[in-house]
Amino acid sequence: MAAALLARARGPLRRALGVRDWRRLHTVYQSVELPETHQMLRQTCRDFAEKELVPIAAQLDREHLFPTAQVKKMGELGLLAMDVPEELSGAGLDYLAYSIALEEISRACASTGVIMSVNNSLYLGPILKFGSAQQKQQWITPFTNGDKIGCFALSEPGNGSDAGAASTTAREEGDSWVLNGTKAWITNSWEASATVVFASTDRSRQNKGISAFLVPMPTPGLTLGKKEDKLGIRASSTANLIFEDCRIPKENLLGEPGMGFKIAMQTLDMGRIGIASQALGIAQASLDCAVKYAENRNAFGAPLTKLQNIQFKLADMALALESARLLTWRAAMLKDNKKPFTKESAMAKLAASEAATAISHQAIQILGGMGYVTEMPAERYYRDARITEIYEGTSEIQRLVIAGHLLRSYRS
């Protein structure tokens, strides 16, 4: 089986994984240490990120530059369609592998990390799970190699966390659906060649009247708003999608009418593992920066790392990071084992995003004045971390999800 797997493998990423069939199911927490194949994957992604992303990350951030060439190379490695089956031109790997790879990319450049996350989790994810065979061929295969990327249009100007309150509408007209409304905060919007859009097809049914659609970009009736000038993740584009009598074929309905809310929620469960992994990368980069600086900066006749106060800070940073990483891996492995993971993905996203914010904050504190200037990357990590507590469900939403599952478990 392993030989056949490798014979079908494509690209340097798969060749780096060795001879074991690494799609074996994992027993959650059977070992704190990663399987050898996943360790090799981590090193491959780290080498790529250090060569291709670290040298340009500050420039991408400063000039709001989309990393076109690097995204293409990531597609060639298989990083843009990691759990998509090989028959659809994906890498055919598992979600633990995806989490590990995304952390390494985000450690080098969080903007590139979210570009990767959106294409894998939010765009390809729902089509892979709910799409027809024809839709998978049309809307997945061309988006695996870096030539094209997709986006995900759920949030609206008047409802971000309240995903069931969509004001965008879709009505049937002959052989078409006609979309009207505005979607907000759409990542990858300016570079995307397609989007998954959620719109109300029956307002009387509230969230049970929401449906999902596949929309090519550009297309008549769809215009892009201005690129948002953001605090962080500045190399990824964020803009509104404005639908004005946007007509798409009837066969572009994803799933069945009224399934949109279910599709969105299950997609966000997957996406939260991605954002947790992005946050882990930011947190790890912040800790690396703080330790390196503290080791080389002398105060009172000794390196900062000799000061107990600095040691305590570093210990707390490492504790938060490792705890969040284990929660994230657990959520990924539950998904790989086809077990429920909604609560666990919310826990992972909450823990990792808050860890990234706290660790990047403390990194600046350790660097002092040097942490506040662009000469060092600590300030970029701090800016990039903040969004991880907001998008794909705020920290408050994650706590509601966790509490809901917790209370139901006590009542059952």
Curated annotation (Swiss-Prot):
Catalytic residue positions: E392
Catalytic activity from the UniProt record: a short-chain 2,3-saturated fatty acyl-CoA + oxidized [electron-transfer flavoprotein] + H(+) = a short-chain (2E)-enoyl-CoA + reduced [electron-transfer flavoprotein]; butanoyl-CoA + oxidized [electron-transfer flavoprotein] + H(+) = (2E)-butenoyl-CoA + reduced [electron-transfer flavoprotein]; pentanoyl-CoA + oxidized [electron-transfer flavoprotein] + H(+) = (2E)-pentenoyl-CoA + reduced [electron-transfer flavoprotein]; hexanoyl-CoA + oxidized [electron-transfer flavoprotein] + H(+) = (2E)-hexenoyl-CoA + reduced [electron-transfer flavoprotein]
Alphabetical UniProt keywords: Acetylation, FAD, Fatty acid metabolism, Flavoprotein, Lipid metabolism, Mitochondrion, Oxidoreductase, Phosphoprotein, Transit peptide
Main localisation: mitochondrion
Location of this chain's protein in the cell: Mitochondrion matrix
The record's free-text note on cofactor binding: Binds 1 FAD per subunit.
Signal sequence, start to end: none
Pfam families, per the entry: Acyl-CoA_dh_1, Acyl-CoA_dh_M, Acyl-CoA_dh_N
GO CC annotations on file: mitochondrial matrix; mitochondrion
Modified residues annotated as N6-succinyllysine in this record: K51, K129, K262, K306
Co-factor requirement: FAD
Biological pathway: Lipid metabolism; mitochondrial fatty acid beta-oxidation
Any one GO molecular function term: acyl-CoA dehydrogenase activity
Protein residues bound to FAD: 152-161, 185-187, 297, 308, 365-369, 394-396
The organelle targeting sequence, given as a residue range: 1-24
The keyword Phosphoprotein is assigned to this record: yes
Entry's EC annotation: 1.3.8.1
InterPro entries the record matches: Acyl-CoA_DH_CS (IPR006089), Acyl-CoA_Oxase/DH_mid-dom (IPR006091), Acyl-CoA_Oxase/DH_mid-dom_sf (IPR046373), AcylCo_DH-like_C (IPR036250), AcylCo_DH/oxidase_C (IPR009075), AcylCoA_DH/ox_N (IPR013786), AcylCoA_DH/ox_N_sf (IPR037069), AcylCoA_DH/oxidase_NM_dom_sf (IPR009100)
Binding site residues for substrate: S161, D269, M270, G271, R272, G393
GO biological process assignments: fatty acid beta-oxidation using acyl-CoA dehydrogenase
Protein family per UniProt: Belongs to the acyl-CoA dehydrogenase family.
Functional description taken from the UniProt entry: Short-chain specific acyl-CoA dehydrogenase is one of the acyl-CoA dehydrogenases that catalyze the first step of mitochondrial fatty acid beta-oxidation, an aerobic process breaking down fatty acids into acetyl-CoA and allowing the production of energy from fats.
Subunit structure: Homotetramer.
Matches recorded under PANTHER family: ACYL-COA DEHYDROGENASE (PTHR43884), ISOVALERYL-COA DEHYDROGENASE, MITOCHONDRIAL-RELATED (PTHR43884:SF12)
Name listed for the protein in its UniProt record: Short-chain specific acyl-CoA dehydrogenase, mitochondrial
Source organism per UniProt: Mus musculus (Mouse)
Species classification: Eukaryota, Metazoa, Chordata, Craniata, Vertebrata
GN (gene name): Acads
